From Swiss-Prot:
Biological source species: Rhodopseudomonas palustris (strain HaA2)
Intracellular or extracellular location(s): Cytoplasm
EC class: oxidoreductase
Residues annotated as binding NAD(+): 77-90, 290-302
Binding partners and assembly: Homodimer.
Catalytic activity, as annotated: (2R,3S)-3-isopropylmalate + NAD(+) = 4-methyl-2-oxopentanoate + CO2 + NADH
SUPFAM superfamilies: Isocitrate/Isopropylmalate dehydrogenase-like (SSF53659)
Ligand binding (substrate): 97, 107, 135, 226
Pathway: Amino-acid biosynthesis; L-leucine biosynthesis; L-leucine from 3-methyl-2-oxobutanoate: step 3/4
A Gene Ontology term for the protein's cellular component: cytosol
InterPro entries given in the database record: IsoCit/isopropylmalate_DH_CS, IsoPropMal-DH-like_dom, Isopropylmalate_DH
Annotated protein name in UniProt: 3-isopropylmalate dehydrogenase
Length: 370
């Protein structure tokens, strides 16, 4: 049995609480002989700043480079609002993405049958929802230069952010989306703003070319990003895989998240390119939710997104798809049984703490393994 090296980065706020439930699951998998994991732990975000005055140390980055997968919690909080910009907690996350060359962000939006009532939309609109949003992660306006604020000297300031995309960046994210669609329902929707942005014109052109050359068997459609956001709310089940740039992907994935009822339910994966020699890729897995400092330490956090993120690591980095399927099933069974953390509680449900939810999911995994 191969041993997989994992780096666990809990981060700040509820990150430590939800990561504890991943550790619980890993410990059980190791003890049961189902899998073999070797784990390292590191600081990131505000926790790293408090210890080392940086958002992530070079030593922790070296551990990330050497791991088969990075499992990331959440960073940030009001405590660090006044720290230098380059050392802000979010800078640790951005460095991980950039140094590991994690260009593809996968955000599934899945509505479990037991939670259709938790959505703000009608149950029939979201029941059975299963969307994958593929967001380009290392280009666009978040990384483009120049990025400045200039004092104009007349009591005014000017801020500049730069949206930049090259052909190869669009090609590789397009291929990720098309490859995923082939394993799902064979449809890709590309979203941009070609009506007002030159990067949108290029994005549309390149995605169309990649489709024509390599993926004619996959259905492709284009939507403007603002219209696409409207359609996500109006008729979300029309979508299978959505591919879009960094900025729009950030927004659209949060819209999709709330279709499911809670940010606490949604995982994500950030993937690098496949190494031609090893066949492996750098990858990081994290919940979509933030550090939620207002509920940190109270046992209220929902660990499902964190556990589901670990499930994505099993599927996309560790070649353990069957185990990932069982984890998905365990989560669904526990929810169907009526267990809920506070963020997804409903009439007649049993409200449980972070650790109780994590323990219930691990117990269900045990039952599924006989």
């Amino acid at each position: 049995m191969a041993t997989h090296k994992l780096l666990l980065l809990p981060g700040d706020g509820i990150g430590t609480e939800v990561m504890a439930e991943v550790s619980r699951l890993i410990d059980w998998l190791n003890k049961a002989g189902i899998a073999s994991f070797e784990t390292e732990h590191g600081l990131v975000g505000g926790a790293a700043y408090d210890a080392d005055k940086v958002a992530i140390t070079d030593a922790t980055m070296a551990l990330a480079q050497a791991s088969d997968a990075v499992i990331f919690g959440a960073v940030g909080g009001p405590k660090w609002d006044a720290v230098p910009y380059d050392a802000r907690p979010e800078a640790g996350l951005l460095r991980l993405r950039k140094d590991l060359a994690l260009f593809a962000n996968l955000r599934p939006a899945v509505c479990y049958p037991a939670l259709a009532e938790a959505s703000s939309l009608k149950p029939e609109v979201v029941e059975g929802l299963d969307i994958m949003i593929v967001r380009e992660l290392t280009g666009g306006v978040y990384f483009g230069e120049p990025k400045t604020i200039t004092d104009l000297g007349n009591g005014q300031k000017r801020a500049i952010d730069t949206q930049v995309y090259d052909t190869y960046e669009i090609e590789r994210i397009g291929r990720v989306a098309f490859d995923l669609a082939r394993k799902r329902r064979n449809k890709v929707t590309s979203m941009e703003k070609r009506n007002v942005m030159k990067t949108g014109v290029l994005w549309n052109e390149v995605i169309t070319q990649v489709h024509a050359r390599e993926y004619k068997d996959v259905q492709l459609e284009h939507q403007l990003a603002d219209s696409g956001g409207m359609n996500l709310v109006k008729w979300p089940k029309q979508f299978d895989v959505i591919v879009t740039d960094n900025l729009f992907g950030d927004m659209l994935s949060d819209i999709a998240a709330m279709l499911t009822g809670s940010l606490g339910m949604l995982p994500s994966a950030s993937l690098g390119a496949v190494d031609d020699t090893t066949g492996k890729r750098k990858a990081m897995y994290e919940p979509v939710h933030g550090s939620a400092p207002d509920i940190a330490g109270k046992g209220l956090a929902n660990p499902v997104a964190m556990l589901a993120s670990f499930g994505m690591a099993l599927r996309y980095s560790l070649d353990m798809g069957e185990l990932a399927d069982k984890l998905d099933e365990a989560i669904a069974v526990v929810l169907a049984r009526g267990l809920r953390t506070a963020d997804i509680k409903s009439e007649g449900s049993t409200v449980v703490s972070t650790s109780q939810m994590g323990e219930a999911i691990v117990q269900e995994m045990q039952a599924l393994h006989g």
